[in-house]
From Swiss-Prot:
This is Large ribosomal subunit protein uL2. Part of the 50S ribosomal subunit. Forms a bridge to the 30S subunit in the 70S ribosome. InterPro entries: NA-bd_OB-fold, Rib_uL2_dom2, Ribosomal_uL2, Ribosomal_uL2_bac/org-type, Ribosomal_uL2_C, Ribosomal_uL2_CS, Ribosomal_uL2_dom3, Ribosomal_uL2_RNA-bd_dom. One of the primary rRNA binding proteins. Required for association of the 30S and 50S subunits to form the 70S ribosome, for tRNA binding and peptide bond formation. It has been suggested to have peptidyltransferase activity; this is somewhat controversial. Makes several contacts with the 16S rRNA in the 70S ribosome. The gene is rplB.
Length: 278
């Protein structure tokens, strides 16, 4: 999919750059694979805002995606590639030989009519899912599991991928987009190829309203508030906040590390925070 530029017929069109979706299916999703979605507006069951900057947006239906790919040794045919409002990647409707339909994340270079299969060991071509331990070293893959049978958790957004860089002690070593290198169990599943829609990051929405259609509300900067409302608030004239960036509740933000799972630290070979080699 390429990028689409628009003529500046209005201020909102000037600079507007969107992904060209002309090659996607234009009909409705499969009803049996969708569910209604109720908007929360960022509120919890008590009506309190628990996640700021959420509200409004176009009505959406949730599409059930097969992240597990545990339907082994049954070949499927890609019926169509669709847009999914719930994620940045495109999705593919697969019809298996036994008649079952399923949505999967569409990888790059997957086209309508292509055959895909999930097996313990399969051909290394986009859309095929297999155990990480059976993939050749150097393979680019996505939708990678962290626990066998749990379903893919790593590399699911547009353009994301993981590269298998080695094997050791019955496990595989993968390199993530962030630069982190870590061990994963060899019996975890992964799907060959990088996720579709890599140009998603190059879009320019052109106007605030287009972001509002996505259900994202504007966020007021802390330095623009009063001291009663934010730790960065107040001061005479424009100020920088006077301290390291914090949330309205005084917790460090913008780069503060929040990882707490020490049990799995031993599986991380190279941290994503390690200095990049020149």
């Amino acid at each position: 999919m390429a990028l689409k530029n628009y003529n500046p017929t209005s201020p909102a069109r000037r600079g507007l750059i969107l992904v060209d979706k002309s090659g996607l299916y234009k009909g409705k999703p499969v009803k049996s694979l969708t569910e209604g979605k109720r908007k929360t507006g960022g509120r919890n069951n008590k009506g309190h805002v628990t996640s700021r900057g959420i509200g409004g947006g176009h009505k959406q239906k949730y599409r059930y995606i097969d992240f597990k790919r545990r339907k082994w040794d049954v070949e499927g045919t890609v019926e169509r590639i669709e847009y999914d409002p719930n994620r940045t990647a495109f999705i593919a409707l697969v019809k298996y030989d036994d008649g079952e339909l399923a949505y999967i994340i569409a990888p790059q270079r997957l086209a309508v009519g292509d055959k895909v299969i999930a097996a313990e060991k399969a051909d290394t071509k986009p859309g095929n899912a297999m155990l990480l331990g059976q993939m050749p070293v150097g393979t680019i893959c996505h939708n990678v599991e962290m626990k066998p049978g749990k379903g893919g958790q790593i590399a699911r957004s547009a353009g994301a991928y993981v590269q298998l860089v080695g094997r050791d002690r019955g496990m595989v070593i993968v390199r993530l987009n962030s630069g982190e290198q870590r061990y994963l169990r060899a019996d975890c599943m992964g799907t060959v190829g990088a996720v579709s829609n890599p140009d998603n990051q190059n879009q320019n929405l052109g106007k605030a309203g287009r972001r509002r259609w996505m259900g994202v509300k504007p966020l007021t900067r802390g330095v623009a508030k009063n001291p009663v409302d934010h730790p960065h608030g107040g001061g005479e004239g424009r100020t920088s906040g006077g301290r390291h960036p914090v949330t309205p509740w005084g917790k460090p933000t913008k780069g503060a590390r929040t990882r707490k799972n020490k049990q799995t630290d031993k599986f991380i070979i190279r941290s994503r925070h390690a200095k990049k080699k020149r």
